[in-house]
Amino acid sequence: METIVVVLMILVCFNFMMKQTFRKRGSVAAIAVVAALFVGLMCPYAIQQSKTQIADWLADAQLMLDTSVVLTVEVALQMAFCMLAVHVLTTGPVKKRTLWAYRALRWFPGILIFPVLFSGLVYLIFSFPGVSFSLVAWSMAVGVLILISVGTLFLRYLLPEKELRLELLFLTNALTAILGIIATVNGRTAVT
């Protein structure tokens, strides 16, 4: 179960980074600053977590179902962005409503990146015992700021074609949806 959650978290991070490749550098920088501030300011809440509490959360079926709903909504929005982006790229003039929906979805960075960043912060705090919690949090915040900014540029360089990035974003979101369904089952199978 924990392995599936870790793979889901990696996919959420990758999807977030891929989505940033469709935005302008200024908005990527703004999102990077927001994510870095989130990591730095979550230190007081992250130090209150315990490993047993996190294990209990992963074992809580109702919490996993609630998280799966949020994951499904985010994946649906990201896939809708991919389909609208292809529609805008391939057709001539588009309706204003379609263009408005495309722009709104392009600006939606995703909300699951924040729980993933929080989880990463908790993991780092547990990994560095004896080190100041705020030092760990703000060091991770600087790392997040640099990683989002540089990682987005690297992905644009690595995949310069917008269509290829859209296809990859769509496919990784589909994989995220499938893994979300698997994680929701949480060891319960329908055996009759």
Regions found by a protein language model. Name each.
Residues 1-8, 32-33, 65-80, 134-145:
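Alpha-helical transmembrane segments of polytopic membrane proteins
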